[in-house]
Amino acid sequence: MSYKISVSPEEIEVLEPSSFPGKIKVIDSQGFEFMKAVAYLRRQKVIGFDTESRPCFSASQPHYGVSLLQLSGKDRAFLFRVKLMGGIPKSLRKILASNQIIKVGAAVTDDVRGLKKHHDFEPKAFVDLQKMVWEYGIKDKSVKKMAAIILGVRISKTQQLSNWE
């Protein structure tokens, strides 16, 4: 299959908008909802993976570490507010270290590096979409542009600069 190398903002603007069709749950403690989320994620063969950190807009501003760990299956997404949880619980670190569950994301190396600064785990079975698109001649690596080129949809990333702490 062949794809466009690049896409312009004007081309993206006319595409059909798209968003995650499943349920999204924000979790900030290790209660019943947390346990249900972990059980669901353990049953998945492939999950989506992303992290968010408090925005840093200048070099002199301190870096605060990962605030949010996002993991999703086909029909459910979980936003774990890891700062409020006192870090990443062991059960989530086990998922991140599992060879049995493929974790897919963009700029995965940076996200994993951010997690490893404060949490001990050995990341396994991660797939970085930004590294894969080069094989298809795609030069645009942002999630928004990859979605436009590969899926033909427009996605919004407006929430990515939110302060999840």
State the predicted function of each range:
Residues 44, 62, 104:
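Active-site acidic carboxylates
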Residues 1-47, 118, 129:
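N-terminal accessory regions of nucleic-acid-interacting proteins
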Residues 34-35, 55, 91:
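Eukaryotic intrinsically disordered and solvent-exposed regulatory patches
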Residues 4-19, 70, 75-82, 88, ...:
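Active-site-proximal helix-loop-helix substrate-binding element of RNase H-like nuclease domains
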Residues 21, 43, 66-68, 100:
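NAD-dependent ADP-ribosyltransferases
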Residues 30-31, 52-53, 83-87:
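Short beta->alpha connector loops
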Residues 46-60:
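Short acidic, Gly/Ser-rich segments with clustered Asp/Glu that frequently serve as metal-coordination loops
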Residues 57-76:
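A short alpha/beta connector and helix-capping loop motif
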